[in-house]
């Protein structure tokens, strides 16, 4: 496989090409933590999928990050002749980007893969839902509030967390793969993935 690290849209980006592409030049987009637990990524590379990432860490799925993602996808499709629709892998906080992007631009996404997703900033990084054991991360919470223009008081009214876009995901009828362990103390299942499960069943 060939890996290329480059800058685009003012951000660090990575793309890894398989030895031989699938017939449709399929690709998977790691929304966050590019090198973490790469079992699925490596398997897809072996099967002929490209793998990519753009560094929008610490933007918490805000509108600017979603627009960077749209522009990055347009760049990838045009520059490398990739399939027009992305398969997006949202691991942990990567779900902030993966879900919010898919909700706004469902026509650009062919499949959404979520692994231990964070779906509510009040669960993580705020750590406010402590009845389920979520610890939060104070330093990240300060960054999050600053990026989103929130205070401790206004954070409770913030509607940009992925959990508020679940109905839009269901309406888009995009294939969704959800992987979750029940011992996650950073983003407890009950405050995050379970919201997705419960609401999808209702919708």
Please provide the spans of the model-predicted regions:
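Short amphipathic alpha-helix adjacent to the substrate-entry channel of hydrolases
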Residues: 36-52
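The feature captures the conserved acid-bearing segment of alpha/beta-hydrolase catalytic domains
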Residues: 134-192, 197, 201
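Short beta-strand element of the alpha/beta-hydrolase
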Residues: 24-33
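Hydrolase active-site cap/lid region
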Residues: 100-152
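Alpha/beta-hydrolase active-site loop
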Residues: 60-81, 100
